[in-house]
Amino acid sequence: MAVSPANQATAATTSAESRSEATGIPGAPKRVSFAKIREPLNTPNLLDVQIQSFQWFTGDEAWFQRRVEEGEENPVGGLEEVLNEISPIEDFSGSMSLSFSAPRFDEVKASIEECKDKDMTYAAPLFVTAEFVNNNTGEIKSQTVFLGDFPVMTDKGTFVINGTERVVVSQLVRSPGVYYSKDIDKTSDKDVFSVRVIPSRGAWLEFDVDKRDTVGVRIDRKRRQPVTVLLKALGWTTEAIRERFSFSETLLATLEKDHTAGTDEALLDIYRKLRPGEPPTKESAQTLLENLFFKAKRYDLAKVGRYKVNKKLGLSTPIENGTLTEEDIVTIIEYLVRLHAGEDKMTAANNTEIPVETDDIDHFGNRRIRTVGELIQNQIRVGLSRTERVVRERMTTQDVEAITPQTLINIRPIGAAIKEFFGTSQLSQFMQQTNPIDGLTHKRRLNALGPGGLSRERAGMEVRDVHPSHYGRMCPIETPEGPNIGLIGSLCSYARVNPFGFIETPYRKVVEGRVTDQIDYLTADEEDRFVKAQANAPISDDGTFIEDRVMARRKGGEVELIDPLDIDYMDVSPRQMVSIATAMIPFLEHDDANRALMGANMQRQAVPLLRSQAPYVGTGVELRAAIDSGDMLVAEQSGVVEELSADLITVMHDDGTRKSYSLYKFRRSNHGTCFNHRPIVNEGDRIEAGQVIADGPSTENGEVALGKNLLVAVMPWEGHNYEDAIILSERLVQDDVLTSIHIEEHEIDARDTKLGAEEITRDIPNVSEEVLADLDERGIIRIGAEVRDGDILVGKVTPKGETELTPEERLLRAIFGEKAREVRDTSLKVPHGETGKVIGIRVFSREDDDELPPGVNELVRVYVAQKRKIQPGDKLAGRHGNKGVIGKILPVEDMPFMEDGTPVDIILNTHGVPRRMNIGQILELHLGWLASQGWTIEGDPDWAKNLSAELRDVAPGTNTATPVFDGAKEEELTGLLSATKPNRDGERMVKENGKANLFDGRSGEPYPYPVAVGYMYILKLHHLVDDKIHARSTGPYSMITQQPLGGKAQFGGQRFGEMECWAMQAYGAAYTLQELLTIKSDDVVGRVKVYEAIVKGENIPEPGIPESFKVLLKELQSLCLNVEVLSSDGSSIEMRDSDDEDLERAAANLGINLSRNESPSVDDVVH
């Protein structure tokens, strides 16, 4: 997207005050903006795609009012729509019926907090009015029926299911409708045209013109027939067909080749194709055809499908009619034959001219969004149809007099369908909660996978590619790398979903070359009819275009210079084409798209730091994104802060009421990061409605703050930052600049077993008192205890199988009581490689009437927090896709320093920039330096004429905003670098070329060349070395191959693969190689003997035969090959399964069990 040159006059700039008004958020922190373009529209609520869809489903009052204001007469919610569809349910004779109406929800049973704490679902009871009518007697019985507990969406757009927060992702699917396509016949190179009628549910209907110029039809993907057979089956005579299609030689030729005479024969012909092997009759054939396309129960285009069909074919069938009509079929055929004949227009039934053209299935006019509400509605429809069957059966079996709606309805299938959807559907996902942007992006995600969507394997390049119709609807940048690229996207900043499920984007109306503030939302196919200018086209104060020719887009994304009078619309904002995460990348316009993609994705992986710091260089989106993420506390009404503590803020409202806001303290998020609230108001402060009163994770003063502003030098340093490695100053470790808190949850339960109940206790066999020192009298660790791997968190014993007791043992048992009973230590221990401090304990037990799963008597959860300082191996990244791993942490005194003695914090390599074409990071570096130092513009230089008054004199440490495609220009940065405020000595450390003279911290000598120095925003990513580093001593082995398992999760070993073996061979390290392949791996006997030899201090014995060799022999024998092993003298060696006696003897002597067999893991199968 082009950016207008700096010397052009653009729309009026915005001041700080007007910006606070424009954002509509009181108490917004100061951020001076380089934006030149006035935006007539505020960013909408970013969670509307989730919240409004669920409101539609439940028929919420707010949704109802909104729709009435938009002019809809009698809006019907999604739940009511399904109940209306299924009602009335009649019995087989039609003498009784049951109908549902007026769905309503009661109050939710428990708060969100309680649900998360006790593993419950945040749900409300759903009631409907059920009416049973006996048609024979006219008797009506009406009852309110409970349909089950229904999961309810929280204010943050999430669901709490079994105690975990989940998000239902919107699905991107092909819209129902009629689609024309053109292919090239392989044999004759002729263009062949076809059309598909795709319903929301029901059989497909396909027509095509083949290479022999005959028109055919395929019903429900069965064999092809001449299209005239279908027309005759619908009751058309040969004469009527001739008359209707007299203009088409193709269709008349098809009619000549069709030998069916009359409707009956045509019906039987269709029946034979659809039901081969069944005896055809006229009645069954007629019923079959009617059921396929003309019965609402079996076939439904849905409102959106009917809307698309009407629009494509110029029909005016009522939108409620979801079945096909005769007129539809005839018009579809006419359109197809005209398309084949090469015509470009046709007159529709309502006497309008419609274009004749093929459809692009990847166009956003033909792809729609199934939002949360619709996905749940489809699931309810499945559950209700199962209930319908039950109701029918009960109507016939129960006594008519005794029937009430309650006795007919079985609610179990509805509950099961909902549970299945929220628990196991591909679209109901565990919410991503690393930081606020991660959660916000997850809720705005568009997923083309899932039931009814595409599959990874089948999706080709076309469907993944960026399409012109994505502009302003789906972000062209933000998508995952890897197999899902292009299949998962993100909603653009201003986009919204209309009632049909199509994505709309806003435009400013242009009337006779003058831009107005009227906003129109257009769908992708409506937009194609208009010419749109970019948001940065220069306009005067009265809204007229300044230039004679304006850069604008036509259909298909073609860009050209156009007369202002020919322009219909103009973009609302330069960031309209990108998603929220992408809009948070400053200088995005200077970054290569591949790197911008990585930048947008890596922001979501940034872990919340101990102290958050907002970026010096932002884009102005930070405030809105943070508030809409729902992770901060926002005042509901204006008032005065009455009382303040770490975990409670009480506000006295202007109307005299009080409201207390609870703050989260050190909670665990779904991804183990720390969720903590911190008040940012004081007692006695006046606050306004909508003002942020407490920061959440990764926010500062209500703005998103994912990382830290660090002083960066861009230079190589002794090769330690080769290949994207990063060098850090030790100051960042000492001052906890990049320190984060991670919280792990450990859980254990005490169950009833066949041999008796398990017990949570401090009384653990064979464990010394010092190991139990931190456990309380119940056997649970105390809060505040420092723990490391292997430490006991909760003591638990499980009964062992008991044999018949001897008289002596019975005596002991009588004296010492239960203590002598055989029990096993099954305590909860800290997993391998983890350390930390116990910060919370939750105990649930049956005795306290807590709901627990069957067989569980007690459940204990322990929360362990870990403070992770930055260390070599951790991954850091900027916002431009510039990522790297810390290679070395240098003492502060060894870091390069500036002329005033300031050492830099971080050294990045210069080689990371040119090849990757993410120059945005260098511009950010310069603007970051400017923001930290402040500047004063003297006089009225040429480069500063587009800067607003608030940018003339900026104090040191002021945060700046450079919005995407409308930010600071290169010449402005160059000019400002020469206008920075001097330091105490009156000097400027960084010259106007953005470089500083640096000195080597070790020798004090200056470096030969000046170096680019400035402040860059650096994020600490979730890929921490503590989670990755791993070492194995003895551990589990695979059952079959007897080789160690792989992977950290299984406490596995490192795979010594084929190429590693070659390396050993190349160096002639024969003994090392033999050890690796035998006693360190799968020589079962050898490894026990080696252990014995090491313990006794003897020489290590000769290795035996590895288990994998025996497995190989067995494999060959299973192929009926007689394989023998021969010694050096040619005699046959008998392969015993294992030297059991030796093995058992050695193991018994040592008191060890080395084999610890485990079932083979996925890794094992792969390796």
Curated annotation (Swiss-Prot):
SUPFAM superfamilies: beta and beta-prime subunits of DNA dependent RNA-polymerase (SSF64484). GO terms for biological process: DNA-templated transcription. Keywords: DNA-directed RNA polymerase, Nucleotidyltransferase, Transcription, Transferase. It catalyses: RNA(n) + a ribonucleoside 5'-triphosphate = RNA(n+1) + diphosphate. HAMAP family: RNApol_bact_RpoB (MF_01321). NCBIfam families: PRK00405.1 (NF001616), rpoB (TIGR02013). This is DNA-directed RNA polymerase subunit beta.
